Amino acid sequence: MCTLLAPEYRAYMQRQLAAGGPPLASLTVEEARNLMREMQAADLSTYAVTSERHKVGDFAMDVIRPADASGPLPVVLYLHGGGWVLGDARTHARMMREIVMQSHTAVVFVEYGLAPEFPFPLPLEHCYQALQWVAENGAGLGLESSRVAVAGDSAGGNLAAALTLLAKERKGPAICLQALLYPVTDFDFASGSYEEFSTGLNLDRETMRWFWDRYLADDEARKNPLASPLRASPDALQGLPPACVITAECDVLRDEGEAYARRLAEAGVAVTSVRFAGTLHGFMLIDELAGDTQAVWAMHLLVAQLRQALGTSE
């Protein structure tokens, strides 16, 4: 067990190990998806929100807003994690409601097509279509389409980073903030954090290889900055929206997330980058850990960044 883990996270990992079960990478895709859904089962009854589902082509979006909202709301376009293979509105329901209630925004939660059924670049194209949909239809739905932030966790952080690159390349729609929560930014499995945390925690090297192989199997194709944003050129990074990058100390993805934050800063992008000590990958998402001090403070940071970028009141 990693000695850097805070007591709450060490206890969580001990419970997971005691429960047994096969490694995620040994499961079928459907078994892995069901496992993630089973692990995320928060009580949502205390959240006073409304949710409307909209279907666009091959994917769907949920527009979630405070039940007492009056007037147009700025938008957080949220791209979920799960290795591009797992995750949906159910797995992220509690976290999305926290963002809505604390930031006084509307979350547009994108259920992009999952790999391997929808490999790269289809999930990213779905996210871009969702951004366009907000720009074109938001006003009629009580959304301020001129004030949009993108956010995502893990593989969703990868998609959020790539979406800002794609929106710049295609000259819009405009994005005012990119919030990247312990994001995937490269396919290099030999970074310092990959070496340090390669086995024994809730996300390991074998599992990340399993995810990448289903999203984009070809190593040469993985060099595309829209798949690996860390490989984007300085010119491509210049002029991107301000970034909030949150990383977990005990996470194979830590170093690539922080490296991307540095690359953005070197390109002149305004960046807030914070590592939360003693935490695991996914610590803001895991319902069982939602009340932990580090998870609470990370949410406070995310909300503060969203409020500042979107101009929402206290």
Model regions: which residues?
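Gly/Ala-rich beta-loop-alpha elbow adjacent to hydrolase catalytic centers
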Residues: 152, 156, 160
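Alpha/beta hydrolase fold serine-hydrolase catalytic domain that processes acyl esters and thioesters
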Residues: 146, 161-314
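Short beta-strand element of the alpha/beta-hydrolase
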Residues: 72-82
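Short amphipathic alpha-helix adjacent to the substrate-entry channel of hydrolases
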Residues: 90-108
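Alpha/beta-hydrolase active-site loop
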Residues: 118-140, 302
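Short beta-strand-to-loop junctions in surface cap/lid or active-site-entrance loops
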Residues: 61-72, 230-237
